[in-house]
């Protein structure tokens, strides 16, 4: 059930709109300013489209396109004009918004960041992509963790970006911290279509969590993005799915975070987010509450290493034209983003 794309709002429903934004080409500060206005105008379109919409979501790369340009002249800052324009648009249209920026980083490569702004224009969530799509993307690994916030109607929201969603641990972290709706923004192109679809569904089902997911759309003359706005219910079923590939179409649905809460408390079979920490609770009181997974221990101890580690062929970005890095994670480099 999606309330006819959110046209029929229930008492506890949250209306979500996913903008399958036309893929832009952004080279200059003037291009950046024009694309900012495009997004601002689409916030207003979303409000006109559905007066009951609570949250409008724009894809990753909505401002900058897919060029991977790290020119500091077109990088954004949290106190810059682009974020200010998004805040004003949300306040003026009385709607929550999720936006993508490539963020200037004086100590390294730019961050691929996402923000959520409420309907008063206040910044509520600030996230930096944790898993850049290597070896293609040059972005600095995110360092803010995964925040979870109180969103529209009190729904618990989390945001991850594109390739993040290919790691089951990311969706699990969102749910473990309480997220009832996980937003996933992306710039993926057509070769990733099937992987995109089944991970959106599995991220929902494995965590009893709604997922709201959207890519860029259309062509920039080089790349072809796919749109594929997709909202999945907490049981993994698809509530809404944009399959037309039509640019700037807004895929809409109502979701029910109250039913997510009910399922997490009331489900027995396939309550996987609970059962992970309570293995075999029929046999032993409270279930086994150990951590039997080797990779978890190794990752936490800084010794994550695959049996075939030394044979992995692609371990930096040189194949995609980037210089081999010498700086370690967490160490600043004055000129890395210049």
Swiss-Prot record:
Coiled coil: none
A biological-process GO annotation: putrescine biosynthetic process from arginine
MF terms (GO), sorted A to Z: formamidase activity; N-carbamoylputrescine amidase activity
The enzyme's E.C. designation: 3.5.1.49
Catalytic residues in the record: 60, 129, 162
InterPro entries reported for this sequence: Aliph_Amidase/BUP, C-N_Hydrolase, C-N_Hydrolase_sf, Formamidase
CN hydrolase domain location: 14-257
Keyword terms, alphabetized: Hydrolase
Protein name per its UniProtKB record: Formamidase
């Amino acid at each position: 059930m999606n309330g006819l794309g959110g046209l029929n709002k229930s008492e506890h429903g949250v209306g979500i709109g996913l903008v399958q934004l036309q893929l832009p080409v952004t080279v200059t500060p003037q291009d950046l300013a024009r694309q900012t206005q495009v997004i601002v105008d689409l916030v207003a379109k979303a409000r006109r489209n559905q007066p009951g919409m609570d949250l409008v979501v724009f894809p990753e790369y909505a401002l900058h396109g897919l060029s991977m340009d790290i020119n500091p002249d077109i990088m954004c800052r949290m106190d810059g004009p682009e974020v200010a324009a998004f805040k004003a648009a949300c306040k003026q249209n009385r709607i929550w918004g999720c936006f993508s920026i490539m963020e200037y980083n004086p100590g390294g490569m730019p961050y691929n960041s996402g923000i959520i702004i409420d309907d008063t224009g206040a910044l509520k969530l600030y996230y930096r992509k944790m898993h850049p799509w290597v070896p293609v993307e040059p972005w600095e690994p995110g360092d803010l963790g995964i925040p979870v916030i109180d969103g529209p109607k009190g729904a618990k929201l989390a945001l991850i970006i594109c390739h993040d969603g290919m790691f089951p641990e990311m969706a699990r972290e969102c749910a473990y911290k309480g997220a009832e709706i996980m937003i996933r923004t992306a710039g993926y192109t057509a070769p990733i279509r099937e992987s995109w679809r089944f991970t959106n569904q599995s991220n929902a089902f494995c965590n009893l969590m709604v997922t709201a997911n959207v890519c860029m759309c259309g062509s920039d003359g080089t790349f072809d993005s796919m749109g594929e706005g997709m909202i999945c219910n907490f049981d993994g079923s698809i509530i809404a799915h944009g399959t037309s590939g039509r640019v700037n179409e807004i895929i809409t649905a109502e979701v029910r975070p109250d039913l997510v809460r009910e399922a997490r408390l009331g489900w027995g079979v396939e309550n996987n987010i609970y059962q992970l920490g309570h293995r075999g609770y029929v046999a032993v009181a409270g279930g086994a509450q150990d951590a039997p997974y080797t990779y978890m221990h190794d990752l936490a101890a800084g010794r994550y290493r695959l049996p075939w580690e030394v044979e992995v062929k692609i371990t930096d970005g040189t194949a995609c034209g980037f210089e081999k890095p010498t700086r370690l994670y967490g160490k600043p480099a004055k000129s890395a983003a210049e």
